[in-house]
Regions:
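C-terminal lid/capping helical subdomain adjacent to the catalytic/cofactor pocket in oxidative enzymes
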Residues: 121, 370-445
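Active-site substrate-recognition segment that forms the wall
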Residues: 21-25, 49-51, 79-92, 206, ...
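Beta1/beta-strand and adjacent pyrophosphate-binding region of the FAD-binding site
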Residues: 2-15, 31
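Flavin (FAD/FMN) cofactor-binding and adjacent substrate-gating region
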Residues: 100-187, 192-193, 199-206
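Glycine-rich FAD pyrophosphate-binding loop
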Residues: 24-44
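Core beta-strand elements of the Rossmann-like FAD/NAD(P) dinucleotide-binding domain
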Residues: 3-5, 212-222
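Dinucleotide-binding Rossmann-like beta1-alpha1 core, especially the glycine-rich loop
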Residues: 48-148, 280-281
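Glycine-rich phosphate/pyrophosphate-binding beta-alpha loops
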Residues: 56, 168-170, 278-280, 355-359, ...
Length: 445
C-alpha cells in the first residue's frame, strides 16, 4: 500500500519548507520531496538572501515589510528549535535605495508611506558620511563596458537615497531553509531527499499523489508545486495545469559576482545593502570583506532562458552551465567600480551562477490550479527569498480555505498580514491574472 499524507510539497527550498511548517502547525501531515540531498540545496543556496522592503507595488511592499518581523526575530519564528548545523543569522545592515532614474523611487516612497515602512531620507552629504567610498555621480543610462560611452566622465549627481534601517540579509540562505525544515520536523513534517518526481497522478481531475523516479508512489489529496526553476516542468506533469495558466514560468540563468572591498574600507562591518538602479546593480557585504554584486536586469544586459535539466547537467552549449562569463563579470564589476571608489577587480571571475524561476511579469504565482488539490508557489526566484515566511503562511491558509470549499478563482482568499494587520487580495498572485505592468519586470519585483 502506498504511503499516505495530507499534503505533499514538491521542493524543500526557502519557500517549500515554510509551507510545510505552517501546514503542520494546522495539523496536516506533510511530506516534502526534493531531488537534491538536503533542504535549501537548489536555487535557494545561490540566493543573495537580501531582505528589503522596496517593490514596485504596494502589496509587494506590504508583504516584504511583514517579512521583516520574521527575520528580525528568527529564533522566535523557528519556535526556538535546535539545528545541528547552527542557525542562520540576520545581518541587519540597513538597506539603501539610491534615488535614480533606474528606480521609480517616488512610487516606492508612496508605498512606504501607505504601508508604514520605517525609512529615512538621506541627502548626498548623509550618504557620503555613512558610505565614504561611494561616488555619487549619476552614470545613467546603464551601459555595458563595451559601450564606447561607458567611461565618459559624469556631470550630474544622484538626488539622494531612501534608507530602511530594518533591511539587511541572511548570512546563509541554504542554512536558513535547513533551519525551517528542522522547525517543521519538530511539528511533525517529514522530508525525503534524492527523490525526483516524474509523475503527478490524478483521478477525475483530483490530484491523488506523485510517482518518483524509482517507481515509488506516494498518495495525498493535496500536492504543492514549489519546485523552483523546475516549476514549469512539474506543472506540465499535472494534466491540464500548465495549459490553463495565463501566467507561465521559465528558468533564467543569472550571475552574481564577488569583488574585494577598497583597501582600508571594512565593507563587511560598515557597509549596507544597496539597490543602485543608476548602474543596474545591487550589492551587499559578503564574508571576506567582499562586495556581492548582482544585476538588476537592465535593458542592455542579455537574458538567457534555459532548460534547467540541461543547465544542471552542464550541457549548455558554452560549457558548464554554472560557469561565470567574462562578459557579465566585467559588466557587473566595472559598473560597481564606477560607484565604489577604489574597488579592486580581480582578473579571474569569482561568484555564483544559478537559475531564477521567473513568471512572465516577475511577480510570483501563489495559487490553486485547474486540478483540484494541486497548488503552486512558483515564479518566486530573484525577489521572493525575503518573503518566504510570509509566503509559507499565506499558502497554508489559502490551501486550507480552498480545501474547505472556497472558490478562490471567484472570490480570492483575503490574507491578513498578522503583524501589519493589512489584508492582501491574493488574487494579485493569481495564475490567471493579466500581466501586471506595474511590475519592474526585473529582480526588483
Amino acid at each position: 500500500m502506498n504511503k499516505q499524507y495530507d499534503a505533499i510539497i514538491i521542493g524543500a527550498g526557502v519557500i517549500g519548507c515554510p509551507i510545510a511548517y505552517e501546514l503542520t502547525k494546522m495539523g496536516r501531515k506533510t511530506l516534502n520531496v526534493d531531488k537534491l540531498a538536503d533542504a535549501g540545496e537548489g536555487s535557494t543556496a545561490a540566493s543573495c538572501a537580501i531582505v528589503r522592503a522596496h517593490y514596485s507595488t504596494e502589496d509587494g511592499v506590504a508583504i516584504a515589510y511583514e517579512g521583516f518581523k520574521y527575520w528580525l526575530e528568527w529564533e522566535k519564528y523557528l519556535g526556538y528549535v535546535k539545528d545541528e548545523k547552527g542557525l542562520a543569522k540576520y545581518m541587519n545592515t540597513g538597506s539603501i535605495l539610491l534615488k535614480s532614474q533606474g528606480h521609480d523611487w517616488r512610487k516606492v516612497q508612496k508605498h512606504y508611506d501607505a504601508v508604514g515602512v520605517r525609512y529615512e531620507e538621506w541627502d548626498l552629504n548623509k550618504i557620503k558620511e555613512m558610505v565614504p567610498v561611494y561616488d555619487l555621480h549619476e552614470f545613467w543610462p546603464v551601459k555595458r563596458p563595451e559601450d564606447p560611452e561607458f567611461f565618459n566622465e559624469p556631470t550630474r549627481f544622484l538626488e539622494g537615497a531612501l534608507f530602511c534601517p530594518e533591511g539587511g540579509y541572511m548570512s546563509d540562505p541554504a542554512l536558513s531553509a535547513h533551519n525551517i525544515m528542522r522547525a517543521a520536523e519538530a511539528k511533525g513534517a517529514e522530508f525525503i531527499f534524492n527523490a525526483e518526481v516524474v509523475e503527478i497522478r490524478s483521478r477525475d481531475n483530483q490530484v491523488v499523489g506523485i510517482t518518483l523516479k524509482d517507481g515509488t508512489q506516494i498518495d495525498a489529496p493535496i500536492v504543492v508545486n514549489v519546485a523552483g526553476p523546475h516549476s514549469y516542468k512539474i506543472n506540465q506533469m499535472a494534466a491540464g495545469v500548465f495549459e490553463e495558466c495565463n501566467i507561465k514560468t521559465k528558468a533564467l540563468r543569472h550571475e552574481v559576482m564577488y569583488c574585494p572591498s577598497p583597501q582600508g574600507y571594512d565593507y563587511l562591518k560598515d557597509g549596507y545593502h544597496t539597490s543602485d538602479g543608476d548602474i543596474g546593480c545591487y550589492y551587499r557585504p559578503e564574508v571576506g570583506n567582499m562586495f556581492l554584486i548582482g544585476s538588476e536586469d537592465p535593458e542592455c544586459d542579455p537574458q538567457e532562458w534555459v532548460d534547467p535539466d540541461l543547465f544542471y547537467a552542464a550541457q549548455l552549449p558554452y560549457g558548464r552551465g554554472n560557469e561565470l562569463t567574462m562578459e557579465q563579470w566585467r559588466a557587473q564589476t566595472y559598473r560597481c567600480a564606477r560607484r565604489v571608489t577604489g574597488m579592486q577587480i580581480p582578473n579571474q571571475p569569482r561568484g555564483v551562477c544559478d537559475l531564477y524561476d521567473c513568471s512572465d511579469d516577475w511577480i510570483p504565482i501563489y495559487d490553486k490550479s485547474a486540478m483540484k488539490g494541486f497548488y503552486m508557489a512558483i515564479g518566486s526566484s530573484g525577489n521572493q527569498y525575503k518573503n518566504a515566511p510570509v509566503a509559507g503562511l499565506m499558502m497554508a491558509e489559502l490551501i486550507d480555505a480552498c480545501e474547505k470549499g472556497l472558490d478562490h478563482d471567484k472570490t480570492p482568499f483575503p490574507f491578513k498580514l498578522p503583524h501589519l494587520g493589512r489584508t492582501i487580495d491574493t488574487g494579485f498572485f493569481s495564475r490567471n491574472r493579466e500581466i501586471n505592468y506595474d511590475s519592474s519586470f526585473s529582480v526588483n519585483g
